[in-house]
C-alpha cells in the first residue's frame, strides 16, 4: 500500500486534474473472487480461510463503470480521492453464504495459517497471498464522499448476484 500512496502523492503534486479511486472488491462475472468461488462451487465445497468474520464491501463492476463515467464528465469529482465501495459491509462468511444460496454447496472453514501456507507453497491455491491479505485486512469505508458526489444508485450484493445469476 505504500507504493500506491506514493503514486497518489505524485499525481496530487503533478498539477494535473485527477480523481483517485481506492477500490474495494470489484465484483463481476470474471473478477478473481467470483471465479475462485465459482471454481470451488463446481467441486461442491467453498473454503473460508480463518473465521470468515473479516469484512468486505464489494461494488459491482457496472456501478464502477457508471461512477468513472460520471467522474470524467463532472467537475465535482475534480481533485478528489474516493473510496470506491459498495453500499453494504458484510463478513466474508455472509458473502459466501449469499453467493452459494439455493445450492447444495457446502461451506468449510480452514485454519488461516494453513491457507497462508498453502498460498506460499502452491501458486494455484484457491486463495493467493495477495487475496488473503486483502480479505483479512477488513478494509471498509463509510463511502460518504462517494455518496455525496455520485448519482449512481449502488447495487447491493444480493441484487447483483440475482441479476448476474452468479449464485
Question: What residue ranges belong to the model's regions?
Answer:
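Terminal hydrophobic/aromatic helix or amphipathic segment near a protein terminus
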Residues: 96-140
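Amphipathic terminal alpha-helices
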Residues: 139-167
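Generic structural signal for individual residues within well-ordered alpha-helical segments
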Residues: 65, 96, 116, 147, ...
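Structural motif detector for alpha-helix initiation sites
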Residues: 61, 92, 112, 143, ...
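Short, flexible active-site loop motifs that bind/organize anionic cofactors or intermediates
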Residues: 54, 85, 105, 136, ...
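Oxidoreductase cofactor-interface core, primarily capturing Rossmann-like NAD(P)-dependent enzymes
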Residues: 1-103
Amino acid at each position: 500500500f505504500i507504493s500506491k500512496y506514493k503514486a497518489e502523492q505524485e499525481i496530487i503534486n503533478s498539477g494535473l486534474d485527477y480523481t483517485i479511486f481506492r477500490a474495494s472488491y470489484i465484483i463481476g462475472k470474471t473478477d478473481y473472487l467470483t471465479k475462485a468461488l465459482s471454481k470451488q462451487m463446481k467441486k461442491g465445497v467453498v473454503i473460508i480461510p480463518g473465521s470468515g468474520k473479516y469484512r468486505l464491501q464489494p461494488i459491482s463492476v457496472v456501478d464502477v463503470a457508471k461512477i468513472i463515467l460520471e467522474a470524467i464528465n463532472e467537475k465535482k469529482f475534480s481533485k478528489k480521492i474516493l473510496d470506491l465501495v459498495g453500499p453494504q459491509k458484510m463478513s466474508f462468511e455472509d458473502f459466501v453464504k449469499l453467493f452459494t444460496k439455493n445450492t447444495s454447496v457446502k461451506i468449510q472453514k480452514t485454519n488461516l495459517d494453513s491457507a497462508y501456507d498453502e498460498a506460499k507453497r502452491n501458486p494455484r491455491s484457491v486463495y493467493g497471498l495477495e487475496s488473503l491479505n486483502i480479505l483479512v485486512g477488513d478494509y471498509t469505508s463509510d463511502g460518504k464522499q462517494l455518496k455525496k458526489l455520485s448519482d449512481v444508485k449502488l447495487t447491493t450484493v444480493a441484487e447483483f448476484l440475482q441479476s448476474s445469476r452468479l449464485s
